[in-house]
Amino acid sequence: MKVIFSIVVFSVLILLFRHKRIETKIVINQPIDHVWQVFKCKSSHPKWNTLFGIDRFPTHVGQQISVDLYNENRNVQFSMQPVIKKLDKYHLEWEGKLYINGLFNGKHQFIFTKIDDNTTQLVQAEDFNGLLVPILNYFVIQPTKFNFDRMNKSFKKYTEDQTLNNDNCKVPR
């Protein structure tokens, strides 16, 4: 009877807590066009991106890209191939999954908002869904929020110190 009760309780918990959203925000003291150009400049990513590496910056919705997630030493911890769900000016969103759909899915968002002519807000968020969310919350989801904050701070510092003037990544100033 205890085993059946435990299975029922565990099943109910999985059904109730299979969604989790994390969100971080940072204000960057640069115009939004400059911030967006730095973000899109793939060749600058190794200088500031402590969270992931991408094979190329996406160009259209529906495109599949390769993303390598880093650990704190910037070694590849996990690779995935998410699909671009939204790509507008100042907004990038992709969706990926762990092995099969519904097990552990994530929708990652980068949203840049103009505060004033010289200030931009970056919101980085992830919506996790799936059966493994309750189990992976402590070991994966909570450390991910910490890593978002770390990447945001690194991106802010790099962007505020950077004047883009090379051929690959130009920003009119």
Name the predicted role of every residue range.
Residues K2, Q121, E126-R173:
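A conserved amphipathic terminal alpha-helix motif
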Residues K2-H60:
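Hydrophobic ligand-binding cavity/cleft-lining segments
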Residues K2-S6, L15-F17, K47, N73-T119, ...:
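Hydrophobic-ligand binding "helix-grip"
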Residues L16-F17, L51, L103, V133-I135, ...:
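Short, aromatic- and cysteine-enriched interfacial helices/patches
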Residues H34-F39, H45, I65-V67, I84, ...:
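Hydrophobic pocket/interface hotspot
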Residues S43-S79, K85-K89, P172:
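Short beta-edge strand/loop motif at the mouth of beta-sheet-based domains
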Residues D55-P58, S66-Y70, K97-I100, T113-D116, ...:
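Short C-terminal domain-edge/linker segments immediately following a structured domain
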